[in-house]
Amino acid sequence: MKIQYSYLKNFLNTKHSQNRLVDIFTQVGFECEAEEGVIEFDITPNRGDVLSLKGLEREFYAHQEKKSNRKLETYKLNSIKDHKIISQTDGSGCGNYHLMLVEGLQIIKNLDAKKRSFIESAGVPLIHPLVDLGNYVMLEIGAPMHVFDLDKLDLPINVQFPKLKNNSLKVIGGDVKDIQSSSLTIQDQSGIQAIAGIIGGERSAVSSNTINIAVEAAFFKPETIVNQARKYGLATDASHRFERGVDPEIQ
């Protein structure tokens, strides 16, 4: 995992140099090295909890025997009464599943340059401003998010294993994948829209014309996601984190 030094320094609220931070995280137990303006961390598979700025902050302050005074901001949203958003969630594969509907967005061309630089330096490709914003949140707090074009969904959503055989999904990027019965899926009333915790389908992907969205935040159980990405030949930033386990309390 690569993290821009300037972002990490500000998030930790420290004046330490880049090399000093490398020394501290090495003492904590992480293999890391400094590159030009970036620190690369070699995170072992059992430490998925540190694949974010928030995770690194926790380790940093534990080493300093101090407590961070940073708190995640919470917002009170208007309740949605007109939609039945989620119909069914398979508890054996999904601990919790949330969708937030946002309507009437103003179309933006790009995130600001600072956020784009942070995302790119982490090795995450820039795709679309809405997707990029979700990836920014993932890098900050460790929670992968997926953004659907709301107008392309036929609500409500079901989170379940496929009940029918011969399912296929054209995933983002254009490849068509035959969906296995062992794969947890996100389905609307018209069919499969995403392979849970791995990748979304092209049919419900956001575009330059998107103005209404459904933002997914979920805890997919690691045992449900592990090895699934490999079966499909897909290695995504989301699957990398869900396989290792994300914090179910931050959704």
Regions found by a protein language model. Name each.
Residues 1-251:
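RNA/tRNA-interacting regions in translation and RNA-turnover enzymes
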